[in-house]
Amino acid sequence: MKKRHILLLCWGLLAFTSCEKAFMDHPVSSDPGSTFEYLWNKVNEQYAFFDIKGIDWDSVHRVYQPMLQEGMDDERLFNLCAAMLNTLRDGHTNLISNFNISRNDSVYYKMVAEKNIDTDVVLLNYLTLDYHSTGGFSHNAIRDGQVAYLRLSTFENAIDDATLKYLMDRYKNCKGMILDLRQNGGGLVSNVKEMLSIFDNHGQPLYRTQIKSGPGRDDFSELFTVLADTTCLLDHPYRKPVAVLIDRGSYSATSFFSVCTQAYDNILLFGDYSGGGLGLPNGGELPNGWTYRFSITRTIANDGGNYENGVPPDVRVLLDPDLTAQGIDNVIETAADWILSKN
């Protein structure tokens, strides 16, 4: 029974927690030194990825604690605490005050610098100017109508059953589907389950998860398996080949979706590594009233991998600058070739 309750808790977090939501606890003290130590200790006891990121948190303390100064004003203290948090290199980590919100710019710039898509080429030569827009998806058929191309740039808005049914019906005569999630920075993790609802679901394992459950670095709950549904949204599950396109800007909920594709024989990932972000954030309140959040869970894929730093594609394809200059997206072309080769 305990297993079931914790599993439901983990899936409940996925279903109802967006990538921007934090949960609060209660403050206990006041001055800058206490605030700094409180934050450092919370991360020390609850952060989930010291090992996979190779972070020595004690060393981080030795670097930043001496920077505390008597009479520090709020802005300087905020900047110090934010700099300490940014050593986690985690896009799910923030410090929030009434005058600023910290964010990990290194994660953002990595997404932008290593993007594996030219949106102008996609718009002009694949979606084309007569594309359709439905429930957040931009879509059209390519390769003489043989391949459905669906572009989804964010998971921030809820995807509903009607949208998915419409798309599957519209492209029912295509030989397969490209789902382009490049530079999709995430959003509602509940969209993962919704998107998977069109496929062949029979309660198969999607991934395993565990929560940081104690103060020790290795204190995690036992691994619990998150399962697919046992029903399908459609009258007949979508079993045609599906190519999911990802890159370093595919983060958080998009990485969760990418991990889940391992459970489906008809889906392959194309492109570059995702941006990771497979820990669900939790947070609380500091002694001075500021709030914080950071990742407290970790996710293990069906193949045993912990892909917090990026989900690997099944077929790695990087944009060819020469082809891009000619208006050709070789990631889309490779995916389309694979789909047509399966028919």
Description of each model-found segment:
Residues 1-28:
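Bacterial Sec-dependent N-terminal signal peptides
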Residues 4, 134-136, 279:
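Short beta-strand-initiation
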Residues 19-212, 219-225, 241, 341:
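Flexible, low-complexity junctional segments that flank or bridge functional domains
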Residues 20-37, 75, 176, 185-343:
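C-terminal "post-core" interaction segments
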